[in-house]
Amino acid sequence: MLVCYSVLACESLWDLPCSIMGSPLGHFTWDKYLKETCSVPAPVHCFKQSYTPPSNEFKISMKLEAQDPRNTTSTCIATVVGLTGARLRLRLDGSDNKNDFWRLVDSSEIQPIGNCEKNGGMLQPPLGFRLNASSWPMFLLKTLNGAEMAPIKIFHKEPPSPSHNFFKMGMKLEAVDRKNPHFICPATIGEVRGAEVLVTFDGWRGAFDYWCRFDSRDIFPVGWCSLTGDNLQPPGTKVVIPKNPSPSSDVSTEKPSIHSTKTVLEHQPGQRGRKPGKKRGRTPKILIPHPTSTPSKSAEPLKFPKKRGPKPGSKRKPRTLLSPPPTSPTTSTPEPDTSTVPQDAATVPSSAMQAPTVCIYLNKSGSTGPHLDKKKIQQLPDHFGPARASVVLQQAVQACIDCAYHQKTVFSFLKQGHGGEVISAVFDREQHTLNLPAVNSITYVLRFLEKLCHNLRSDNLFGNQPFTQTHLSLTATEYNHNHDRYLPGETFVLGNSLARSLETHSDLMDSALKPANLVSTSQNLRTPGYRPLLPSCGLPLSTVSAVRRLCSKGVLKGKKERRDVESFWKLNHSPGSDRHLESRDPPRLSGRDPSSWTVEDVMQFVREADPQLGSHADLFRKHEIDGKALLLLRSDMMMKYMGLKLGPALKLSFHIDRLKQVFWKRETILWSREGLSREVWPISEDTALGHFFSGMDKVFGSLSKR
């Protein structure tokens, strides 16, 4: 037994006659490694990397503009907090140190200060901004005042992407460990599927390999780290790396080693060995006899009398020993496990910080549209989830593809995203894959599915509440009288039911005046993120019937006929006869214009709108939200900046929209395709009436020409 109490004593162990894959301990070289494994490095032209690595002239504390990795539509101010090789460790100003991320110096996601404004954009607070959102402009001024800006000359142009995927299975490369992005490790291409490649880390096992596109900036050619000065980790010793990687090869067994500090951790699943030279509290027993013997699969792994527990704050992921990897075709499967690495800002994945759970329900009795097979829809589960939002989105989208008559049609509606789950479709005798966008909120899932279903013309297919038989049997007319009992998003029914092309003149008039085809103002004027239910009728049913009767007698040419309809219109739109509005109006606060409300008025409105929301009224004082700000609020904004849960945010969004309907009566008329455009009028009833008859003249004029 050898026990040492100092780092120098531990370093003396390196002289023992032991090697890792043919390289002396702590001296990994690609040349010897490639010879011993009979492997081929991936050619340089396979990668989206510069042939000559760019120089890194950045300095600690420099400021620059960077894309928020958790909200890719936002450009934020970032500070350089670390440097390694050709990479920068960045921290978004206004965020904490738990969401640091790494970018190459030639990444297109980093730009010098002023680039966003130059291109007409605005700098945004990062997701999870710790201060009040209203204080962001002042925070931005203080942050940039006197700060050292990264000069334009040290930024590099991003290299072009390869023309197509040149990778082949078994090629060697260097890849970023996405669980610990400050590590770059030797890896192997485990599988090639369309534009995607499977990255497997050499010498490690588990289910932590990852798929990425062939033009990912997280993979590098062999020798990249030696050129840039970055630190390349040696291969692990969890599994023996075969000389001839084969998809059919069996899972290799462990090989005992006397690597300086990995010995005690080698047989503990879920832990990763340390780099040579790192301090530790206690040195384990060194097993010198039979250093190269390989136990059989049935043999029990070596056990030590005492095992170190995990460090405080570290998370251990349980794994089953010798379990076959689910996705990797080679024996070298997982991304290096990192339980023993300190959980600093760069090691905590942002996805672990906030993982919203969502459940999406399927409406099997709804319209599936022309692209989806109703029989296949019936075979799907009643709901997807509850699970992480990204997983549920992937399941729902994949279900639409699998149930399509032609998968290519549904696949064409989707755009390549970044950071999300992978979906696949089979057409043209090939399997095609695509990354969905990263999901950072539950509302994003609902909006995404709304747009997809609208393209598929299968509205009312998904919802975030179970579809009851009562709801499914409601007609458009019944819904217009009863929709105040439902909250927006409670049953996620898609709007924008556009009028279809009609063949006969009578059908054209019915389509232009049918209540179910008249779209409400809130639907056309809604801000992004508002999700209405079925559109409320813009005209009372009696008005529609009367106009239809007048139209059936002939075209309205004379003044008398016009006066008849005007009288009937005003009669049905007189005060107190707004049948198309809800029977229960929101609090009016003495009839004042909501845009003139003070913060106290807004708090009173919240309390009176729903007593259950009274506990949230103080948030409006804290964030200084007056009437004008109230009218601009959306449910996703209330969740993101005010910290509200989904339910209260949807309720408040519903009451705010009803408030707009009461104070600003905007009439929206959905016309057919006969050369008429759809307009929204924030105007009085008399003016709207004039527009109505002007539009009627256009319709009848078009019909008379035929």
Curated annotation (Swiss-Prot):
One of its GO terms (biological process) is spermatogenesis. It is found in: Nucleus. The keyword Magnesium does not apply. Residues 597-662 form the SAM domain. Keywords: Developmental protein, Nucleus, Repeat, Repressor, Transcription, Transcription regulation. Residues 576-591 have a biased composition (Basic and acidic residues). InterPro entries: Mbt (IPR004092), MBT_SCMH1_rpt1 (IPR047279), MBT_SCMH1_rpt2 (IPR047280), PcG_chromatin_remod_factors (IPR050548), SAM (IPR001660), SAM/pointed_sf (IPR013761), SAM_Scm-like (IPR047531), SCML2_RBR (IPR033763). GO terms for cellular component: chromocenter; male germ cell nucleus. This is Polycomb protein SCMH1. Induction: By retinoic acid in F9 and F19 embryonal carcinoma cell lines. Gene3D superfamilies: 2.30.30.140, SLED domain, Transcription Factor, Ets-1. Its main location: nucleus. It holds the Pfam family SAM_1. Associates with a PRC1-like complex. Interacts with the SAM domain of PHC1 via its SAM domain in vitro. The keyword ATP-binding does not apply. SMART domains: MBT, SAM. MBT repeats lie at residues 28-126, 134-235. Belongs to the SCM family. Residues 272-283, 304-319 have a biased composition (Basic residues). Residues 233-350, 576-595 are annotated as: Disordered. Residues 329-340 have a biased composition (Low complexity). Associates with Polycomb group (PcG) multiprotein complexes; the complex class is required to maintain the transcriptionally repressive state of some genes. Most abundant in testis. Moderate levels detected in heart, brain, lung, liver, skeletal muscle and kidney and lower levels in spleen.
